[in-house]
Structure formats: structure tokens, C-alpha cells
Amino acid sequence: MPKVVALYMPPSVEYVISVFSVLRCGEAFLPLDPSWPRERVLSLISSSNISLVIACGLSSVESHWLVERNVCPVLLFSMDEKLSVETGCSSFVWPCKKERQRKFCYLMYTSGSTGKPKGVCGTEQGLLNRFLWMQELYPVVGEQRFAFKTSVGFIDHIQEFLGAILSSTALVIPPFTLLKENMISIIDFLEEYSISRLLAVPSMIRAILPTLQHRGHNNKLQSCLKLVVLSGEPFPVSLWDSLHSLLPETCFLNLYGSTEVSGDCTYFDCSELPRLLKTEEIGSVPIGKSISNCKVVLLGDEDKPYEGEICVSGLCLSQGYMHSSIESEGYVKLHNNSLCNHLTNDCGSQLYYRTGDYGRQLSSGDLIFIGRRDRTVKLNGKRMALEEIETTLELNPDIAEAVVLLSRDETELASLKAFVVLNKESNSSDGIIFSIRNWMGGKLPPVMIPNHFVLVEKLPLTSSGKVDYEALARLKCPTTGAQDMMQSNGTNSLLQNIKKAVCDALLVKEVSDDDDFFAIGGDSLAAAHLSHSLGIDMRLIYQFRSPSRLLIYLSEKEGKLREDMQHNTTQKLDHKIESQNGNGLVSRTVPLHSGVTSGPTPSKLQCEKNNSPKRLKIDYEKFSPKRMKENKLWDSGFSQIQCAFSRCNKVHSPESCSNEEANREYWSLEIPRNQMVSMQEIWKVHMESCVDASPLVVLKDSKTYLFIGSHSRKFSCIDAKSGSMYWETILEGRIEGSAMVVGDFSQVVIGCYKGKLYFLDFSTGSLCWKFQACGEIKCQPVVDTSSQLIWCGSHDHTLYALDYRSQCCVYKLQCGGSIFASPAIDEGHSSLYVASTSGRVIAVSIKDSPFHTLWLFELEAPIFGSLCITPSTQNVICCLVDGQVIAMSPSGTIIWRYRTGGPIFAGPCMSHVLPSQVLVCCRNGCVYSLEPESGCLVWEDNIGDPITASAYIDENLHFESHELLASDRLVTVCSSSGRVHVLRVRPSILSRDSHDSKVGEITRMELQADIFSSPVMIGGRIFVGCRDDYVHCLSLESCR
């Protein structure tokens, strides 16, 4: 028998290292979840004859209590600690040198019907067989990423990290505590890290489904999430249907198994489900057929040849239970004459595990799960014996008898319900339930604590004297719904609304004002349900755990919003208000050329609907352009120049006005060379939902317009000077792409997630024409003034050329992948370049109709960022999601490559004021400056937070120049964590220049949510969208 080493730590790098260290030593590991009650942890350590406990040193509080108990040796281990002690030759003997082979390599406990957990002895061959089967049928192709996020108490967690390590695939481990407290954050995690494969239980997917549906068809998940494995619970067909509509390109697998069979033994590919549903009426997705080297049979009655108990044999089989014979407690030898309709040959006289689950074989040969005959259930993917919960309850001195059942509501949401008979001397007041719940919290994991308690005088019995479970199941407790309560105008107070929502989430009749949500049965799934019902951030439920405390917080916030509304609506436009530093924004002044300091990441987004004002009033004295020397741009009315500014320094002008005119020296603003600079917010406009789109700023008729849309489907035209609204309209789908104007500036063009491209009147927003593509539109349209065409790509893999005057599509091009990146037009060569998520780059001749393809090139990774053309060489700059920056010639050959240190999701930035630099922003937090002609690195600057948006170079504001050198320019960069940085960049770089002389941060500001919008910076003003539901206007200010 191998020695057993317990691992007391959550999913982490330390955990993965510890697992492989134990295996390398030839021993077995036992996962211990730190969230389990201490009494349960000590019980498992005692019953397993543990030789050593390895605990994560970062969890000092949780680890040290084990040392104090002195039950066995404890090793504290942390990756953050530097090991300075030199180690000599190890005394360990590697497995290959040992005379014996270990019987099992891991020990995992499952709930037992006797009331005691049972330790399953799992084998290496079972784990490897599961991995090799997956790798053969669903191999890892290209650069993918796995996520390790499942609790270590669940058998499926092993394949999460084992599959990544054995296939040399990147493994991303999210903050386990954050996911536990805010289950909805898993969506942002999957998007941010472009996770390719996800393993989850259906109940978790059901909990986050409303948020997924609210966000609509999420292109980022559609492009990155290749495979989703569902296991641990029945997978409803209705849930698959919802998921498939949101993620049509994602492969969904339904796996079935248990800890005794290495986690999984059958599978069903949901791509076969539409075909199957034509011939079968089923409510849950089949569990399918056996995986490689596993044998699955049905043991049942002869009169039902295609139905019976699921029995499993093969390489997946474990070595039985700790301290038990292999041929006991469910492990039996079966013969052919006892099998009703076995699914494999050669199954006589073999050892099988009787799962206790019953299945039926469909005409296709697939198995479908139909239930259990014993009282073992699965909740949130965790298998548990109801008898163990009942045995624990009856240990409570106030309880005489207890029965626990699994119940489901009309939405198939499962929960545990306990029917309790109290001792005669016990007090049956409301406080007894609270006391029992607290007592249970120290005995069992949270998932095993009943959600609802029912006090009964006696348990109903059958005629044979046994507990009548069916009669108990019919004793339904009334629940109250929470739908639409937050919009109710009736007499119910906010407190009653909150309590109703809590009752609905916990499936209980009533709660008191001071009940602790988690003490009375709440868990992360119930918290997700409650947060969705109330429309609040899930983390608030963990912070304000009772209805009364949550009421106080929400009331204070509501009062503050109402006060702000009343104050702002009574002010006129020219009235002054105080500095906006009180609204949660952080502004600081940094000395010129100072280094970037990395601070803690701000809190994540809190998307909350409110009635806050459309804009904030401006203190014209405080933010007077006079603070900047001769600020002609924002003070003179812009003369009669017409031009449009959009992300990546893309400037579009009518045919009568060249781009150079729009940026001529007349518009130049100058700052003294040694002047200190700070940043202030001068207005923000509420967009009712997240603003991921980048702004389009247009100068026309002596006015400055800003066009932008949000996830709320609202598209707005705003006065860029004051923040007042010109007009707004509601589109049919969510907006994530940027807008563009047509050649004569008479219309503005914007796409949405419903696949529609709208042509709106510039002055009024009224609809002129709309074009329907076959997929979502996130790509910013591009205008070709010479031909009066609008070019735009779609998720349907097609590039469209649209004649907005004739209102028709004149050309289509299949691009082999979804088009997120805006095309680039080379007017000199009359060529257009387009890239797709397949990595394909295509050059099209647009000189004469019909248009035709010049060349096609397949690059190694998807392209999400817009393309850029260098003015001097007309090379095309492409940024790949794998971190490569590639320059291609007009003839389609690669000129140079540069590999950054992380993924790139945004396009490069170039400007005539920095002609010798291409700026690229990377997810690793770095901004790279590359030479356009050679690809050599000019400088690299790390702002300390991930970046998913493009930079912007202010072409109108600069520092006073030295006699021999060009003026230093200003560049704005926004991190995805919500920080807006302004860098000072030297245009002319000498080889002897230090890093600080090339680039340095001069100021920064912190917004209150994530930023995925690429900024636009004109004359010291920065326009950017944010996931706090606002579009912001920030202004640089010279410090006196």
C-alpha cells in the first residue's frame, strides 16, 4: 500500500506541483478542500492514516490550525517563498527503482449510505485512460488554454490540470475565492484569458445563463471557447438548447461517471442531439456510449431488455474503497446470463462496479440516465448519500428524527429539504432552525447542508412501517416569487422585496430581517440567483449577508443617487459644480519621465441600472482651456474643417479636405517642457450598460460630435465639448463596434449584434437605410471616399461592400473566419486588406469593378485588431492574438516579425507626428514601440495592468521642442482594469538614449470599472467608454 499524503489547499500552482511531487515519490495523494469544516478534515485525516499534510503557506490561518492540532506532520509550501537552503542528494527512491508497484495513486472520499464517507482508491491507468481517450477524439490543436477552477473535492478537478500538463497546454488558474464569491465572474475570466476548454456542472451553467443571455451573443466566447464538458448531473435538453443558441460554434460533451470509475466512463457529443431529437422524446441529454477501454452494461429484469442498473468495468475501475475488500460495497463479478442487454462483448466473469444509477438504451445505442433506486443524489455535481446527512442531523441534541429529500422546483432547480422531528424538550421556536443550520456548518460541507427545514410532529410511514418518502415529497412548502419586485410601485418596501428575493433563492417560506443568507442555507448558486433577481453585484451578498444590512447599503446608495439627480437637474448648464474628485475617480500628478508604479487592481465591474443624470455639469472656470497655452482647438470653434477621428489614430476627411489639413500646425497646442500635468474628468454620459465600443469624434460645421453605442442597444450623438445630448436611438442589438461617417459626412454608420448595419442621418439619427448580414457585426465600418462605398465585416465570415447611395450590396468576399478587425485601404495602390479570426489575410483590388482578390495568406493565429498601413512603405501591419506583430508587403510577402510577451487583441497605432514608431498594446501590460520598416524594438513600457485596447497619439498637443529635437508627444493608453495612462514619448530616438528619456508616464486616472474601449485623444481631451456604463471625457490640465 502506498503512503497517503494529504493536500490541504485550493486549486493553485502549489496544488499542481504537490500532486506531481507525491506521484513522483511513488505515493498517493488525498485532496482536502479548505472550505470543508475542520471536524470533517480531521476525520478524513484520521481514517486515512495520513503520513503528511502539505498545506499552502499563503493560507496561513487555515494551515496553522493543522499544526496546532498535531495530528500528523504538516509541510507549509508556497511558490512565493524563495528556497535558499541547498539540498543534497535526495533520499527518496523513485518508483522505477522500487520493487513494489503502488496499488492506487489518489484517494478521494465520497458520501456513504452508512453515514460515513467512503475513500475511493483511484489508479494511474484510470486517469491516463481518460486523458488518452479525450486526446484521441478531441485533440488539442494549436494554441489553447485550459482552466483549473473546480474544487479539489470533486473528482473532475484532476482532469482539468492533468489534461493541460500532459498535452503541454497553457493552464490558467483563476482566484478560487473570487469565483466562489461571485460565480458570474467566471464569464469575465473565460473572456479575458480566452479559455478554450471548460469543465462544469449543469447547475453552474444554469446559474450564469441569465447573465450570458443578458449580454447577448458574446463574440469573444464564441471565438475562444472550443469545448465545454458537462458532467456530474443530468444535463437538460432545454439548457443545451439555450447554450447552443449562444455558442453555436462550441462543442458540448455530456460525460457520465463517478469517483469509482476515474470520473468518467461514457460520453455523448451534443452535435448529434438535433438528429436524435427527431426520433426520440427525451428531456435530458443522453450519457452516450462508453469511452475507450471501458465496458458499460445494464443489469436488470428480462421483461425490460433495454433498461437496468448501469455497471462499469475496464481500465477506469478503481481499486475499491479504503479498508474494504474490492468485491464489496458495489464491486461485483457479473456473468453474461445476468446482463439484460450489455453494450459490449466479452463481459462474463469480470469485475464490475454497480453504480446504483439506472439507464435506458435508445435505438441509437446511446444510454440515457433515468434515475437511482437508492438514496444517493447529486447536487451541484457533488454526489452525496442522503443517509449521511440524516445521520449527522440526528446527532444534534434537539433532533429526534430527520429525513432529507432532494426536491426540484418548476425550473428544475434542485435543493435539499430536511423534515425534522424535534425532541419533546426542545424549543420549536424560529431560532431552532438557525441553531441547527449553524451546528451543521461545523459538521458537513456547505453543499450537504439542507436549504430548507420543515418541522413535523412525526414522519409519515408506509403500511410496512417504513418512512413514506413520497408522502413527504408531497408536503410542498409555499414559496414567494421575486419577479419584477424591484420595479413594483406598490406598498411593499425595499426590505420586503429583498426578503422575497431571498425566499425565492433559498426556496423557503420566510426569512427574518437579520438572517445570515449563508447560515440559513445559501450557497454560491443561490447567491447567483439572488443577485440576478435583485440586479446587483453578487459580491454584495457576501459583504452584506442579511436582508437588513443589504437594505441599509442599497438605501444609502439609492439616496445618494437621488440626491445627485435632484442637485444636477436644478442646475443650469452654465452653473458651476465642485471638482469631480468626489465621484470615485482617482487623479494624480506624476513627475515627468517617472516610472510606472503598479498598484492593486481596482474592483471589477458593478453594472447597476439607475436614473443618474445624462451628463455632469462643467466647471468652466476650473477646466478653462486657458490653462493650456493658446488652446485654439477647444476654444476657437474649430473653424470650418471637417474630419472624423477614431481609434488607432484613424482620421477620415471629405474629398475636399486632406488629412494633413485636419492636423496642420494651426491646430497645434504646446505645453512648457517642464510643466507638470494632471488629469480631470469634465463630463460623462450614462449609456445604461457597458460601453466597450470606441468613440468616433467628428468635427463638422464648427461643432464637435461624439458618436458611441453600448450594450444597452443605445446609440448616441453627444456634444463632445459639453457632454449634452444631440440625439439618441435604440438599435435592435447590442453595440460593441465603433461607428464611421460616410464620404460626405451626411450619414453615420453603425453595426450591432443582430447583424444589422444602420445608416443614420448625421443630424437627426433617423434611419436612412439598414443592411442585414448573416451574423453579428462588431467590426468598425471603413469608408472608401473614391468609390463612395462602405466596407464592413461580419461574424458570418463575409466582408461586404455597400453602396449607401443606391442602398445595395455590390460585393461580398468569404474570409474563412469571423471579421472583428476593420479592413485597411491603401489608396495609392487601390487595394484593400482584410483579416479574420482564422488568421487569413486577403488583399483585394478595388480599383475597378468587378473587384478581385490579389493574394491570400494564412497566418498562424487569429487576428482581432484592425490592420494598419505604413505611409512610407505601404506595408500592412497585423497583430495576432498569439502576440506576434507581422508586417506584410503590398505583394503579400512577410517583411518582418516581432513577438511580444502576451496576446494582442487590438490594432497597432501610427501617426504622422511619430512617423518612425508603430505602437502596439499587449495583454501582458506592455506598450511596444517598433520601427515600421524593420520591426526593431524602439522601446517597451509596462503600465502594470493588462491592455486589450489600442493606444492613441495626440496629434494636436505636444511639449515645447528643443532647438535640435522634435517635440515630445502625448500617448494615452487604457488598461482593462480601468486605468487611463498618459505617456510622454520622444519622436526622435538615439541609440544612447535611456528608457526614461524615450518614454515616461506623466499622469494617470482610475475609472471605476474595466475598460475595453480604445480611447481617442484630441488636443489634451481623452474620450473613452467604460464598463461603469458611462462614456467619459477627461482633460489634461497644466499644474500652476
UniProtKB/Swiss-Prot annotation:
Belongs to the ATP-dependent AMP-binding enzyme family. Pfam families: AMP-binding, AMP-binding_C, Beta-prop_ACSF4, PP-binding. It comes from the Eukaryota. Gene3D superfamilies: 3.30.300.30, ACP-like (1.10.1200.10), N-terminal domain of ligase-like (3.40.50.12780), YVTN repeat-like/Quinoprotein amine dehydrogenase (2.130.10.10). SUPFAM superfamilies: Acetyl-CoA synthetase-like, ACP-like, Quinoprotein alcohol dehydrogenase-like. The keyword Lipid biosynthesis does not apply. InterPro entries: ACP-like_sf (IPR036736), AMP-bd_C (IPR025110), AMP-bd_C_sf (IPR045851), AMP-binding_CS (IPR020845), AMP-dep_synth/lig_dom (IPR000873), ANL_N_sf (IPR042099), Beta-ala_Activ/Resist (IPR052091), PP-bd_ACP (IPR009081). Residues 489-581 form the Carrier domain. Keywords: Phosphopantetheine, Phosphoprotein. It comes from Arabidopsis thaliana. The modification O-(pantetheine 4'-phosphoryl)serine is found at S524. This is Putative acyl-activating enzyme 19.
